[in-house]
A protein has these predicted regions:
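Class I S-adenosyl-L-methionine
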Residues: 1-199, 231
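Conserved S-adenosyl-L-methionine
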Residues: 182-242
């Protein structure tokens, strides 16, 4: 695998933890990045002892300097109200954050007076005073009634929220192949851990959904499967987008 490569293994929850031990041995525990939980279906009613299973696992490993295109998800309306509770006169949602941080610097640029104020005891400004003054001139500092300055962060200037390790990408409702994967899930993985022109390998390509996603994302691809039916389905899927 390339020094910038990554590997994602999608596995059933029943054997996932055993497979992880093998992956640790092959790729090294130090290269383990995530055990991602994928919500695969809606809740079901089963007459058995145990909790309903709606998830499976994706094990993610990479080397020291992998390709990593930070994925972001759009904020929901609920996110915006929670994370950016304030609104200015123009109707823009925002929040504020402290402009000082723990740790004291006695002689550095981040310990100088700003608008006649020094950082609180045991803290320093997050940036130099020139930057603070520029923010203030640009209207990016909010002053409280007691004179406490805070940095304004506008919601419409943020790229969205970071993707966490619980993903809700349910199985296709009408799959064309028994093990067909959710195309949005594959898009996320491919665009995060590869660049245009990178090679994407799916050694159990099944219906070819991974290869189609790679093709549409301008990646090169290699697909392997021992089933002649899988090869036929994959060929049809790839030809449908050419």
């Amino acid at each position: 695998m390339s020094e910038r490569g990554s590997i994602y293994l999608h596995i059933d929850y029943k054997i996932g933890h055993y497979v992880k031990l093998l992956m640790d041995e092959i790729f090294g525990m130090e290269n383990f990045r995530n055990d991602i939980t994928r919500i695969k279906c809606n809740p079901k009613n089963f007459n058995r002892i145990g909790y309903g299973n709606i998830k499976d696992l994706i094990l993610f490993y990479s080397k020291n300097k992998p390709i990593w295109n930070e994925p972001r998800k759009p904020y929901t309306d609920q996110d915006l109200k929670k994370l950016f509770p304030k609104m200015n006169s123009e109707g823009r949602r925002y929040t504020t954050v402290p402009i000082h941080a723990p740790g004291e610097t006695k002689k550095g640029k981040s310990s100088q007076p700003f608008r006649g104020q020094l950082p609180p005891s045991g803290r320093h400004w997050r940036t130099d005073v020139k930057a603070l003054e520029r923010w203030d001139q640009e209207g990016l500092i909010e002053w409280s009634r007691t004179g406490n300055p805070r940095k304004i962060i506008f919601a419409d200037q943020q790229e969205g929220k970071r993707v966490q390790d619980i993903w809700e990408y349910k199985d296709p409702q009408y799959p064309s192949y028994p093990t067909e994967k959710n195309s949005d899930l594959l898009d996320l993985i491919i665009r995060t851990s590869s660049d245009e022109g990178s090679i994407v390998l799916d050694c159990f390509c099944g219906s070819g959904t991974t290869l189609k996603s790679a093709y549409l994302s301008q990646r090169k691809w290699i697909g392997i499967d021992q089933s002649e039916h899988a090869i036929r389905v994959t060929k049809i899927k790839i030809e449908s987008v050419e």
